[in-house]
Every structure is written in C-alpha cells, then in structure tokens.
Amino acid sequence: MARISSVATVSAHASRRLAQRNLTSDDVQYVYAHGRLHHTGKALFIYLGLRDIPDEHRREDRYRRLEGTVLVLDPATGCHLTTAYRNRQRGSRDIRRKLKRSIL
C-alpha cells in the first residue's frame, strides 16, 4: 500500500545520518511509500522489512539493500524526517517495544 504524501523536509541530523548510511532521497521516498507505519511515543516510525518490498523489486540490489531501514518522522506532520537508521536483525520489534508515552 503506497502513501500519497512524501517526506518534505529533512533535519540537519537526518541529512548527516543519510549520508553516513549511503541513503539517497529516492531511497527515503521508497521506504516512505512501502514501509510499515508505527506510532510510538513522540515519533512516527516507518520500517521497511523484506515482506514490504514488492515481489518484482526483491531481486534488485538497490531495493534489497533498503531492508531494515527505519525512518523517524515528526508525528504532527509526518513529513519532517528527524533521523534514519538500519536494523535488519530485530526489525520492527524494537519499535513496538518503545515507550507509549514520554517520561517527564
């Protein structure tokens, strides 16, 4: 299921992390369009697992390398990228286990 909108703005921290992880803006848009959405705590997470990659793209390295990519977005707009990381081994389990509310 593809989303209509896309990532509009990227923080300075996120652009640094994207460069470190060799992710382009096209990669970010692909993960945004095909990944699973998780609302947890004060962030919106989008996780791209192997099952989220369409069958016709699974054999292509440029899409397969995106497996395990997590985008962390501002929950208010859902269009401001805060950071990005990869977690191929534990996947979305870590995201689902994060605190549901913030601790003050």
What are the residue ranges of the model-derived segments?
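Ribonuclease/tRNase effector modules and their secretory precursors
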Residues: 1-104
